[in-house]
């Protein structure tokens, strides 16, 4: 290990950063937000509010639930339990320890509760406080989130996926004419609360309006209006306007002329001005709204209508006899011929009728007259009977039920979002705090529904992202917490009523198990709490950014239609239109777009640049789908001059509804931040995505997530510029916590001295222990490698170590290989891939996979199981890898069947034969009363043991191996402590010497006289302890020395304390499951080389299986002798339409040849001492402006940069803003290659040129998780299914290959009768036949006799279950 002391030159880490030639034209004004902040913000900031003081916590998340559940009172109101505050303990184990010990990473929730007890005077009923007790109560352990946004539950890393669900609020829609045979549109409205009962209002085919609660039996909508306290008159007045008809003697009725109510139609009678008597239009002539407005403008106020025109109109008030006040007809009744004659007989002069016409139908009036309920009471009874059928109804119960349904905040919650949505849809102005329904809401929902039926307004689009919101981790767990606390509340009330309340403390009332079990159940069994996809860093990030429409309260994949799954215009910049699974979940599981974020209401927002009067500013505004509809938004690639002014006469803009319009520059409100904001992280890693077909791009994004981390990582030559961001945010790489200087580096850890603090205080030291060969969730290997050297100066958040699938701080999922597109003897037929032996020989695509095997020694009825080397009937050869305790050594090479851990189990006593008695007498007891139950390597696994962990139960004596492992870990901790202390001491004492030199000593070590001036020579002769003994004249210096000593002692004490705590944890034994005495875990690493049958893929959805590995000398090669690595079939391109891979290959070819050119220039500089200017000129030509920071450095650094570039020139071609065909040609031209990107290729077998030029270039290929080693499988004998007695299927059940119906046809076609009989009987489910075959094989005979297959017997049994007695009659 190298370590730093002042003689090593400190150099910045920045020159390690990779430079990519970027083809992007659009300046990035906004950085990609942290890719996993969606998880961390939701849980840590919004739910737990971990880093917030009690007094400053907002009423959200955990705080809001506790506030809403407490205070809890007992039924007699004597006791009251209030919530004061909550806090979390420090977790007992850190993340790594939890993973190793199979524990959950959690922390104890401590809630301070206050119990107030009151004295109630029985006579007056007045209350006095009797006593107050305040106590901190343990409420169970709550899982904490790791820094990477995951949870550790029982030792496995899990992710809680965010859920997309319908936003609370009110929605209006119609059935698209599907329900009624006449294709009539039936409109309906639905109120969806966050929690509580659903309310539906709907039209039927006869235009009567009904309502349902929770999809129960329907009732008339007016019953609901009456239940909220409206009378018939109020209902009619609220929903209808009225108009007055006055009698004109002998002529008819005069009525107000209302042009707004007129539609285009032919008149049935003359249009007469009532004031003048003029006929304006004759019967049969056409009137239009425009003409009506013209007449109104010319002074037409009233028109004359005939007496009969009133027939069929509805009264807008009760019709009374002018003399007797007797009611002749009630409000809302229709005027009939009879009623009209009564009106003329009684000489009634004025009649008020409802305005009902083609624009406003009589639906509510008709419903009202169909409804039998006349008052509120009968309406409430009606509702009660539907919801509680069979229960006796009384008015209190009915009122209470109706109130609890929609108006009780404890049972009904629209949530703040629901209220905002409701207000905006119904144009109301109710406070956001009112999260229950109000009477205004119900009245206005019905109003809007009727307006929709009258063709005013539009229905809601439920797939619009303004109507769908995201529930992230915090909110999902908050809902579980609420369920747990509500259950706990019931038990608290019971306990309050049960015991003597005066002696009870708060902790006696609270039962935390109820809460813990709910939270535990959510994390371990919920559909949204998922085993993290940890194949590679990209799959981790994607999993954390996933949005699922499935899960509790969401859709089910069987019922989800096409519309829900489809891409919607509002997905733009919010949800990726590309990345979604193939198969039944397509469109239901999505990925968030790269730049998207989730706002406080759960709606997804996308960033845009503000445009003011045609000038594009750098101000970035995040808009949700609802807000976005109000603006005109231009594309990111709209032409802009250097001053930011939009160019061109018209700009293409998106407007509401996903439509495009051309507008003038000054009308544009926003433009996109970058074209990349449309797609997800995985899709943004595909170069030339714009040249690929969407289906293939989908496969490409999905397959990148299945790429296995390789031993040698290699970032793509042709990237998109996002690689660094993904590697950094994924948590796979190690980031520096503070600015500092690297003190020590080895393969296991990095020690950095943090700088930037006050000089006189002891520096802090950051020690980064790297992960070495750890197993991921998917058995891939997690291994970190340092990137820094001793003496490097690192800044905070610099990448100091690479993780799996990262290379120099960039994500590297595969390797760059030389690819040729040509057919080769049919070996690349149907997407097969031909590879060169070099790929295998040089481990280009070799990966390490780690399997974990566990054995538990339990306490059984017959005695404890024992882990031992002393196993009965096992040869010494089989025990060769085991130590004296019976556990395998680290480093042992094992294959299937080898013993990993020796274990014996006591077996029950059986009767002893005389021979056994004799053997026992001779050889002793031991061998007979135990059976071998050792852990063996399962079939198909071989490799090297890389780690062994031994866990012993508390109180059980540890074995040698456990003690050795523990000692090793303590030594590691001691080394960390000592190194940290050494660095601190070095700087403390050098600072102390600086302070002392030149000071006059008053007091000090014996060798130094009083009054002597201290020099560095004097100090060299003293020990470190003696330096603290000095007292000097200068009081200020003395003060500084004392401060320094205080800092030093504090740091030293903290270090020792931390060390002691960790050692105590190691030595204290482990919490093992019930009955387990000892657990041993063995990790075996297997190297998987590439072989035929392995699946490989590119980034463009081009996938294939390796068909053959060809010797290097037989592969095609270039004119300079370079052998092609991989041969792909050119026919895989045209029909798939993923042309991006061809452009990638061409640019990769340019990259290799540019690298050769740079290498040539460097060689020329070295050997011929050519001027460095030539190199600089070439670099400027290649990289353009973004190379200036390199060119300003020294010649050595430029040459060092060129040496790196000589391995391959790296390009970045951002999605939708990348290299065009011309740019690719420019690079090929600069590299001195043919612009077609094709070369002459020579056949390795014949040595002759191929007839045509071949496309060759560097292409980035991935090795996918579908390895042939894990799939290939065979069986000779094995388990059989219980009922059918046929062999099981599948590798996991050690099953057979099914010889199915079609295979039987094949044998029938060939007439292979005996083979067929064998297949259907003795090789399958003829039990007796199987036994006979076995017998004849043992005896060495060739007899074959088949019986009746078991499946036939099963069929007969099924017949019998149908009461058909079928018997098989066997004739001899």
From Swiss-Prot:
Keywords carried by this UniProt record: DNA-directed RNA polymerase, Nucleotidyltransferase, Transcription, Transferase
Keyword Transmembrane: no
Enzyme Commission code: 2.7.7.6
InterPro entries: DNA-dir_RNA_pol_bsu_ext_1_sf (IPR042107), DNA-dir_RNA_pol_bsu_external_1 (IPR019462), DNA-dir_RNA_pol_su2 (IPR015712), DNA-dir_RNAP_su2_dom (IPR007120), DNA-dir_RNAP_su2_hyb_sf (IPR037033), RNA_pol_bsu_bac (IPR010243), RNA_pol_bsu_CS (IPR007121), RNA_pol_bsu_protrusion (IPR007644)
GO cellular component: DNA-directed RNA polymerase complex
GO biological process: DNA-templated transcription
Record field: catalytic activity: RNA(n) + a ribonucleoside 5'-triphosphate = RNA(n+1) + diphosphate
HAMAP family, alphabetized: RNApol_bact_RpoB (MF_01321)
Function: DNA-dependent RNA polymerase catalyzes the transcription of DNA into RNA using the four ribonucleoside triphosphates as substrates.
NCBIfam families listed in its UniProt record: PRK00405.1 (NF001616), rpoB (TIGR02013)
The protein's name in its UniProt record: DNA-directed RNA polymerase subunit beta
Taxon lineage: Bacteria, Pseudomonadati, Pseudomonadota, Alphaproteobacteria, Rickettsiales
